[in-house]
């Protein structure tokens, strides 16, 4: 077998898609059947403008919260907690038993810990020196 290893700083879409589809096909052999559902929970002001919310993926018994954001004028008013509580309330009847997420050291680790999340992992000095990335989960 005559194989050649390559490296690039300019990844092309064709190579990316080949790798992505390959790992997805492999994963599908080991994961239960089911569709990943995109979910969201939002906060709107009096004018109906979106001022915050969360987005994530629901798959079988789990939710991964990808993003939680509030406009800076609406922070420190309990809205983040309300969003997370609403998420739990809505997904638990769907059979969800665990919520997972990640956060950086400059974001909201203490917030999630106060909500009952448990830190289950950490990258140090990622994505830059002096910044950590934390992985959390909460069994509901």
Cite the ranges covered by each PLM segment.
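Acetyl-CoA-dependent GNAT
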Residues: 3-66, 71, 106, 123-125, ...
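Conserved active-site tyrosine of GNAT-family acetyltransferases
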Residues: 19, 112, 117
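A generic structural signal for beta-strand entry/edge sites
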Residues: 60-62, 98, 133
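Conserved acetyl-CoA-binding loop-helix of GNAT-fold acetyltransferases
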Residues: 76-89, 114
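Conserved GNAT acetyl-CoA-binding A-motif
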Residues: 91-104
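Conserved catalytic-core motifs of GNAT/GCN5-like acyltransferases
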Residues: 100-102, 118-135
């Amino acid at each position: 077998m005559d194989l050649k290893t390559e490296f690039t700083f300019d990844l092309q879409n064709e190579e990316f898609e080949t790798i992505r589809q390959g790992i997805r096909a492999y994963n599908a052999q080991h994961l239960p059947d089911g569709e990943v559902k995109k979910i969201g929970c939002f906060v709107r002001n009096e004018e109906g403008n979106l001022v915050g919310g969360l987005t994530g993926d629901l798959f079988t018994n789990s939710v991964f919260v990808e993003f939680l954001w509030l406009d800076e004028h609406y922070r420190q008013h309990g809205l983040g907690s309300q969003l997370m509580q609403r998420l739990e309330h809505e997904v638990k009847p769907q059979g969800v038993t665990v919520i997972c997420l990640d956060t950086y050291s400059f974001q909201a680790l203490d917030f999630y810990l106060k909500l009952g999340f448990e830190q289950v992992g950490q990258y140090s000095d990622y994505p830059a020196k002096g910044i950590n990335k934390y992985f959390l989960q909460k069994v509901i």
